[in-house]
Amino acid sequence: MITLYNTLTRQKETFEPIEPGKVKMYVCGPTVYNYIHIGNARPAINYDVVRRYFEYKGYEVIYVSNFTDVDDKLINRSKELNESVPDIADRYIKAFYEDVGALNVKKATSNPRVMNHMDEIIDFIKELVDEGYAYESDGDVYFRTRKFEGYGKLSHQSLDDLKVGARIEAGEQKEDALDFTLWKKAKPGEISWESPFGEGRPGWHIECSVMAFHELGKTIDIHAGGSDLQFPHHENEIAQSEAHNHAPFANYWMHNGFINIDNEKMSKSLGNFILVHDIIKEVDPDVLRFFMISVHYRSPINYNLELVNAAKSGLERIRNSYQLIEERETIATDIVDQSKYIEQIDAIIEQFETVMDDDFNTANAVTAWYDLSKLANKYVLENNTSTQVISRFKEVYQIFSDVLGVPLKGNKSDMLLDEDIEKLIEERNEARKNKDFARADEIRDMLKEQNIILEDTPQGVRFKRG
């Protein structure tokens, strides 16, 4: 039985799907005007794990995540680069697939694009106008926020609270400062579409409502995204969707925590804006994913190299223990009864499922993986060789790998072979003889980065993999 924290009710609830055996998920995707940053990568990874766990439990998951390919940021980028909005969007959508693919994020069931749903968006807005939930004003269309009685229920704010910070910008012809834009009047030189309200383009919030409705129907099981989207984006989605559909928009709302960089908020002005496209050239994508899931999805993450290196070491311990089990398989027999180990392994998988059932607690799931790794090391050190036990170890390692999305083996092309290490040790010895200590230290540090430890022995320098 899976429970999850529902932002709408601010409590954990037992998950009950609309349709037995099926989960309909909508996850807000990126605005494709640039490469995604690690703040975008977090929900991609977190909700990929949620999807994987539902699938592990036997559910069919319809996973929809959109691309915002019409937006102020894209229009500004278009002017800056002197390229068309569609061309820029196409380029960064391709880059998105490459980046999240490197992070082992499964491809969504569907990735709808705003431009492909323009007719549906216009019809949706027209129906809101016809029902009195929206109004036209000098080429723009606004949603009548006060007409929707439940406004503020997701962010747990009253209309009076919201009114305090609301204002009408220059050029806006709103009835109320709380009203938000559904359709923007075209400006000279900007991409636009014909509509009954005049030429223009959709507002940000309406895009997700329409794509979710088109892909998943009136009511979806889970709507997810970053905490920064809770208000106003998700609040506005609820208002316009429920006004249009006359039904609850989503039964469960999930929001992941923020990412800080060295204890500071990530921002371009601070110069700590990290793009996935860049960081995966320096940090193994498997390590980055493992780092992300080592923290509960609702908790904030502090990104720094020390913590990433700790995640790297942790993942290497797991992989090394799995390699030992694989090597033991070649000499496995069924001579001795070792059912006690089967019981211990089964207790760990039960522990894993218990914590994942509790709001997808990947931090504790990783702890269960470490426990499995320790047990595997103990098993090998005792020179045990039961085929049954080794098979069960491998099976559970694979379950953890599949659910958490972290491969059991790294990219072999990135690993130094033994003969390469021996050559580097010889080169280091030669450098020390020649008093080239800078080169000797450089080789030592390079090997250390590969988690290879050098040891001085009476027989000479030896190495071991950490």
Curated annotation (Swiss-Prot):
Subcellular location: Cytoplasm
Ligand binding (ATP): 268
Keyword tags: Aminoacyl-tRNA synthetase, ATP-binding, Cytoplasm, Ligase, Metal-binding, Nucleotide-binding, Protein biosynthesis, Zinc
Cofactor(s), by name: Zn(2+)
Motif 'HIGH' region: where in chain: 30-40
GO molecular function: ATP binding; cysteine-tRNA ligase activity; zinc ion binding
Cystines in this chain: none
Metal-binding is among the record's keywords: yes
Binding positions for Zn(2+) per the UniProt entry: 28, 208, 233, 237
Record-stated family: Belongs to the class-I aminoacyl-tRNA synthetase family.
Protein name: Cysteine--tRNA ligase
Organism for this UniProt entry: Staphylococcus haemolyticus (strain JCSC1435)
